Amino acid sequence: MNIVILAGGRSAERQVSLVTGKACKRALEDLGHRAKLIDPEEDLPLRLWQERQAGCDFVWIALHGPGGEDGVVQGMLEWLGLPYQGSGPLASALAMDKLVSKQIFRAEGIPTPEWLVWDEAQPLSWAECVARLGSPLVVKPSNSGSTVGISLARDEVSLAQGLALASSVSSRVFLERYIPGKEITLSILSGQVLPAIEIIPAQGDFYDYEAKYAPGGSRHLIPCSLSAAGLARCEAAGLRAYRVLGCEGLARVDLRVDADENPWVLEVNTLPGMTPTSLCPEAAAALGWTFTELVERMLQDALQRAALTRSAPSGSRPSPQPA
């Protein structure tokens, strides 16, 4: 097949996206496909139309962050009639907006940490924030990925610094209750839950951008240290979160697990990193899959769903389903 890979873009996750795109390009070429990498610019709609006219069969999205995994590119590809891997426009948009996804989780009875939206026009004092959510507090931008803009506030000074950081990458910021315990991530491929990974930061127990990307910033446990019952609860919560947002293909669910092994869903990433050292390929490797085999499974899954969509009377993707 002729495959166009979208990688790079303008988000804060540009460099990770480029590494993902190049790794996937090599894997797709190893599978016998012709792969072409495009770094999206303002003329992307025209460029994709031209690629379609030139015989493009499939688009592989390796973008991260706003403009890549928020449903914009997915909607564009739907309109052009070009198949692609991963979730559709609606699920992508819902998952990208952490505030909206948390509201859905709460409505569906999926445990997620308590939060409050920061209102710059009516700012709360540190004492008021702590009274509602406890201390420390997690400061988060509503729509960013790769832990960009996330920080842990332990006092009034670090709260102000965290708010400034989060506001630099998102117009909406919220504070979230910090759940002491374990950081667990679940990779899910079309309903199949891959082995859970426990993430242990080298410094403290908060998984931020530095812990994620700095050499030696964290270590991973596979299998994780949860009991069989705790792992089952974690997998059930992660799968429910995946389904209620209407995710398709590969997605990653990030959770905290407290001292009683109760899971708390933090967010869902519909276009997780796909570098050879990323979490999803690491989980797949625990099943004996190579990176190329994971890419092949993702591609075949997407092609099967595209065929079903074309044959459906409405020609549309499925909507999010109650868990």
UniProtKB/Swiss-Prot annotation:
GO terms for molecular function: ATP binding; D-alanine-D-alanine ligase activity; metal ion binding. Residues 102-300 form the ATP-grasp domain. ATP binds at residues 130-185. Its EC number is 6.3.2.4. The keyword Manganese applies. Pathway: Cell wall biogenesis; peptidoglycan biosynthesis. It is an enzyme of class 6 (ligase). Binds 2 magnesium or manganese ions per subunit. One of its GO terms (biological process) is regulation of cell shape. One of its GO terms (cellular component) is cytoplasm. InterPro entries: ATP-grasp (IPR011761), ATP_grasp_subdomain_1 (IPR013815), D-Ala_lig_Van_CS (IPR000291), D_ala_D_ala (IPR005905), Dala_Dala_lig_C (IPR011095), Dala_Dala_lig_N (IPR011127), PreATP-grasp_dom_sf (IPR016185). Its main location: cytoplasm. Cell wall formation. HAMAP family: Dala_Dala_lig (MF_00047). It catalyses: 2 D-alanine + ATP = D-alanyl-D-alanine + ADP + phosphate + H(+). It is found in: Cytoplasm. It comes from the Bacteria. Transmembrane segments: none annotated. Mg(2+) 1 binds at residues 254, 267. The keyword ATP-binding applies. Its cofactor is Mg(2+); Mn(2+). Belongs to the D-alanine--D-alanine ligase family. This is D-alanine--D-alanine ligase. Keywords: ATP-binding, Cell shape, Cell wall biogenesis/degradation, Cytoplasm, Ligase, Magnesium, Manganese, Metal-binding, Nucleotide-binding, Peptidoglycan synthesis. It comes from Synechococcus sp. (strain JA-3-3Ab).
